[in-house]
Amino acid sequence: MTETKRFDVAATFGVQARPGLEVLGFADATHPQIPVPRPYCFRNVLLRDVLAYLHDAGGDGLFLTGPTGSGKTSLVTQIAARLNWPVQSVTCHGRMELNALVGQFVLVQGETRFVHGPLAVAARDGHLLILNESDLMDPAELAGLNDILEGQPLVIPENGGEVIRPHPRFRVFATGNSMGAGDGSGLYPGILRQNLAFMDRFRVIHVDYPDPDVEKAVVLQAVPRLPELIVDKMIVVAGEVRRLFVGAGSEGGPELTLTMSTRTLVRWASLSLAFKGAPRVFEYALRQALTARAEPEQREAIHRIAADVFGDYWEPRP
């Protein structure tokens, strides 16, 4: 994939933009690592920040921080989908080592062969590397990315000293629920404080939950047959659950230990339509979408919020 193509920003992303404003992507739309384009409502400021980084990384990575399910990863993948930009996506965890990103020897048809990892492939071929939940990974391992983030060659001693010089279109994204400084809220078990030198190599943008109007458009794109009145009520419920999750206005901190992400909201809407006609359909769908994994007291609290918002729609009277 070497041939590039210019894309009109307004037409490609469905946003208002200066006439003639273009962004560079790839001409080949057949690469298997290009994400599948899905209905998506781009937020102008976030789109601008990601496109600016894609245009000129300046020796940086881009760290996207925000609450769970706010759309950090989908923002990047849906931009990539529209620019025909292949993506190497990895979900990090506490036991992941740098070798899993660079590559390692594996047994292939009875022979030991070196297989390049997502970092090596992305750097070599000009793909996007997305490190999902990067703040779950051991900071000592992530620090091994410092040099390549600055444009230095990736040297692989295990493969005979192979040297991979980063492709000019190679970009590194990392997502996390923290800003690299650990989790002071206690809501995200497993998050680790990251190495300061590693974080210093990233630009940082905050991806919060969409505004109600944007979120309404997202839900209606995904579930167009659901009445707008019901979607509006679902969004009000989601907003209240999130407020209690982050502890807004509460001196005692968070009152809920789970939240309603945009993807959970879409799931609730989809299930409500799928179970249309069932008794107490919105409660039934909400339980499957979110509250079945909540503590009983928190489940009751969320259902009470929903009942107050939905009124007679929650439990229709005979």
Label each residue range with its predicted role.
Residues 1-318:
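C-terminal regulatory/interaction module of P-loop NTP-utilizing enzymes
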